[in-house]
Design a protein with these regions (language model features):
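Conserved acyl-donor/pantetheine-binding loop and adjacent beta-alpha core of acyl/acetyltransferases
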Residues: 60, 64-96, 104, 152-157
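Conserved GNAT acetyl-CoA-binding A-motif
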Residues: 113, 118-133
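Conserved active-site alpha-helix within GNAT-family acetyltransferase domains
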Residues: 122, 133-155
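C-terminal "cap" of GNAT-fold acetyltransferases
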Residues: 132-133, 150-171
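Conserved acetyl-CoA-binding loop-helix of GNAT-fold acetyltransferases
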Residues: 99, 105-118
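Hydrophobic adenine-recognition pocket in adenosine-nucleotide-binding enzymes
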Residues: 12, 97-99
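A short beta-loop-alpha structural element at the N-terminal edge
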Residues: 7-20
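Active-site rim helix/loop that mediates acceptor-substrate recognition in acyltransferases
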Residues: 30-57, 65-84
Length: 171
């Protein structure tokens, strides 16, 4: 990313959801794990502080969304955030995160991840959990460990976690 590129990371808004869905489809359709617009809208309504976007060149370039859980468990594809999010939970699940293809390689994925780690700290979470089909390297850069690999609907998913109590207070 060039020194004069303006970047803003902010909470998502209702009007951002269609673009977030497009980015998600671009990133995850090849893996069979793309989300529906309605799912993103529910996530925003349920936990707006856990749903962020990165804007550059007046365009949404990346997003990340999350929810809080009471107990550690495996994420599942197509879960309803109204059923799974628990405001008093101390485990942050990164439910989806992607960078638009033309903006990859600029460090935007790490910026989104760092902000989600910061949100987990602010929310009093002790652990972050996620599953990924192909971005293991990104999460390993921030200390995530692969818990195991599972298969759902024929899709191989690495379940990864980060103990943020030992991670430190800086994302």
């Amino acid at each position: 990313m060039s020194d004069n590129t303006r970047i803003l990371v902010r909470n998502a808004r209702d009007q951002d959801i269609s673009t977030v869905t497009e980015i998600d489809n671009e990133a995850f359709s090849p893996y069979g794990t793309a989300e529906k617009l309605e799912t993103f809208q529910r996530r925003l309504n349920i936990f707006p502080d856990g749903f962020i976007i990165l804007v550059t060149n007046n365009e949404i370039a990346a997003y990340g969304c999350s929810e809080k859980w009471l107990q550690e468990r495996e994420p599942g594809l197509d879960e309803d955030p109204q059923a799974t999010h628990q405001p008093e939970g101390r485990i942050l699940c990164i439910t989806a995160m992607a960078v638009k293809t033309k903006y990859r390689g600029n460090g935007y994925g790490l910026l989104i991840l760092d902000k989600l780690i910061e949100i987990a700290h602010r929310e009093g979470c002790k652990k972050i959990i996620l599953e990924t089909t192909h971005a293991q390297g990104l999460f390993l850069k921030r200390g995530f460990k692969t818990v195991h690999t599972r298969t759902e609907r024929g899709i191989s998913l690495d379940v990864m976690s980060l103990d943020i109590e030992s991670f430190g207070s800086k994302a």
